[in-house]
Amino acid sequence: PNGFKIYWAEKGVMIATGGFSANEEMRTMYMGPWAANLKIRGSLRNTGENIMMTRPLGAKLVNMTEFYAGPIVPETHANPARVSNSAYGMIVGKDGKRCVDESLGQAMRSKLLPQVTPDNRTFIICDIKTNDEDNILTKLLDRFKRLNSPVYEANTIEELADKAGINKANLVNSVKEFNKVISEGKGPSLVPPHNRKKAHPVATAPFYAIPMSGGIAATFGGPKINKHAQVVDVDDKPIPGLYAAGN
């Protein structure tokens, strides 16, 4: 309220302010337009201003495209990973079409979701048999209920599509194709492929649609440092008095 304070550093400045996961402009600049749709899983304060302040000093910025990703429901911060990382279910966009290989690890899968959908809004479509894996569906439903995070349930795929706002015709066709190909043991032939070694059909009511988006937890880029934690310039020479630590 009383204006800026100016501090004069006698021996140097240490930057330890985290990354830029919450800065949409920087994500777009360094990762691409799709990254604007990533949902925040980590701190809203990781906005990267101090990283950008090193640019006029000639700092070499490295690893600016790298980050850790994971699934999230952005409105409630519920985490659907327990089911999305299981051997059950398929992942579709709001158009009702499968959009990613479900066998991918959660970080890679979450990075792809905003690239293969227009709005980074998807659903895990699964059935009650998902509980065969350590009762994971019931555990997720209990947690989502505590967080007031919606999960849609129905006795038919058609009804499920209506409840979740998914394209009905496409979802019905996607589930039929998925079940047929999985039953034949030809999951890798799907587009996109399904490479789970023990794949399961979505065939036993009740059926569930669990919202999921790709989220960003932390970025890994920033000013490059040497073994003395000195920030270096584009020629890898130390910038006097400037140090950095962290991601």
Question: What residues fall within each predicted segment?
Answer:
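Short, glycine-/Ser/Thr-/acidic-enriched flexible segments
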Residues: 2-5, 12, 19-21, 45, ...
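Glycine-rich loop(s) and the adjacent beta-strand/alpha-helix scaffold that form part
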Residues: 3-72, 78
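Short coil/turn connectors at secondary-structure junctions
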Residues: 8-11, 86-87, 118-121, 237-240
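Generic beta-strand/beta-sheet core signal
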Residues: 10, 16-17, 62-64, 93-94, ...
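Short Gly/Pro-enriched turn/cap motifs at secondary-structure boundaries
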Residues: 41-44, 79-82, 103, 114, ...
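An anion/pyrophosphate-binding glycine-rich loop and adjacent beta-alpha core
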Residues: 47, 51-53, 59-166
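A glycine-rich dinucleotide-binding beta-alpha-beta segment and adjacent secondary-structure elements
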Residues: 170-246
